[in-house]
Amino acid sequence: MLANIKKTVLATAIIATATTGFASVATAAERSELTVHPKEFTTFVRNFNPFLGATNLHTTTDFMYEPLVVFNEMQGNTPVFRLAENYEIADDLLSVVFDLRKGVKWSDGETFNADDVIFSFNLVKEKPELDQSGINSWVSSVEKLNDYQVKFNIKEANSNAPYEIVKVPVVPEHVWKTIKDPSTFTNENPVGSGPFTEIDTFTAQLYIQCANPNYWDADNLDVDCLRVPQIANNDQFLGKVVNGEMDWTSSFIPDIDRTYAAASPNHQYWYPPAGTQAFVVNFKHPDPAKNEALTNVDFRRAFSMALDRQTIIDIAFYGGGTVNDFASGLGYAFKTWSDEETHKKFQGYNTYNVEGAKELLSKAGFKDVNNDGFVDTPSGKSFELLIQSPNGWTDFNNTVQLAVEQLAEVGIKAKARTPDFSVYNQAMLEATYDVAYTNYFHGADPHLYWNSAYNSELQSGDGMPRFAMHFYKNDKLDGLLNSFYKTADKNEQLEIAHGIQQIIAADQVTIPVMSGAYMYQYNTTRFTGWWNEENPKGRPNIWAGIPERLLHVLDLKPVK
């Protein structure tokens, strides 16, 4: 059910916890606390291990562990240098040299240098379960040229290597070299390089993360602390954000003008275009009937034709999105990369057509054998698809519920499931799910989406994200994905993109629904400097995985 929001009087929660042993942070009554909501948690577990993205707290990367470089996606991946001051990629695209920033200290006062970078990458190499981005498939070795210069040797020519390299967290060698098992280490008292490293308060319902006393860029930091309240679901979030308790959020708000913006002139939002959202099916399903259905391309096409995408956008997202009728999932934001012949050839399979879906199912042998109103497989097996979305993700939950109803119209039996995110995610990693609704990364070009969503090299190994866990494999597709950045020539990349598009579209690997928006809300009551339509410096979200949030927080200043 969509949340029914009542407007309440604006209130500001004041945290009066005194700080001790941390002279660089003002007392709680005086300091500026930026209240953020990067992710839903049913309870907080004190885990600040930057290599454990599935279980850590989502203010760990960027804010505790600063990257070498932030590539600003909205500005064409323009590099903004952080722990590094420069990089240079070799003409043959087989190595990258990073010049590190001198004068940087870890939060405990120890000096940051090349040894920390070398250690961090070797740690991921020795412990592949810590490799969240697949960097081990790109980097063969790391060399120390001097105390502030590091060379990365690349396995194959890759013009995008710097972008991939900076995704790996850099941790202090002097701390982590004594950790026996980094894959289970929760890092409760972190030593970091970013702006907020000090855990001032921690409970299951609230933690406050305060300024690094040795932050190298402290002159540009005006926020004293991040305040992170525990929020379990969208309904709980809506109560807080409408009440004026939150400063920086990136969650779904139904009917945002009426429920949020109307509550206060200080309640602002900006929703720049974002990436693809789609239904993913499990090609490795252990159940014979479900496997027979899900691995049949005409069944996937009929599933796709059953979806009234515009209705889903209008109801589940209150109009916040664009229909994605590309069988490849490419989306109109990347239309300049599209082979329009391929797009049009398969567009009909990604357009709402109830009768067409029924005809395609019948042609493929899916008929109602037992007269229960739903189709059975061509071999006569009955099945019911369980379609999952994470609990509390109201827009996703409503999307799935609408899809279940629309699938029933063409004779496909399905039921919605809303497990906690960790359960949802694990089911995808272990191939124990039927169908899942997910969003995807959105980059400066389509490769980030396509590679993370379809490269079979990302379907195995601990720490891999969920996006390619449909377990569809195509060697030619993998080859094209892996060759995209072996050239820096845009015309050659366009030709490769057309080949990628053709394969994914022809096989209808996933069922794209829409191109979403970067949901972002901000409150001007307590802070100024927010990114918005008039100040579009970068992707504005507070989510982990958006490194631009580091640059964003440095632009914020408390209201005097």
Task: Enumerate the language-model features and the residues they cover.
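Short, glycine-/polar-rich solvent-exposed loops and beta-turns at beta-strand/coil boundaries
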Residues: 80, 133-136, 320
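Surface-exposed binding/hinge segments that line
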Residues: 88, 99, 133-178
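Gram-negative bacterial Sec-dependent N-terminal signal peptides
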Residues: 1-27
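N-terminal lobe/hinge region of extracytoplasmic solute-binding protein
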Residues: 37-91, 122, 191
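Intrinsic-disorder/low-complexity, polar/charged segments enriched in Ser/Thr/Lys/Arg/Asp/Glu/Gln
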Residues: 33, 93-97, 149-151, 225
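Cleaved targeting-peptide boundary
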Residues: 26-34
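Active-site-proximal polar cores
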Residues: 513
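Extracytoplasmic/periplasmic ligand-capture domains
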Residues: 3, 71-74, 88, 97, ...
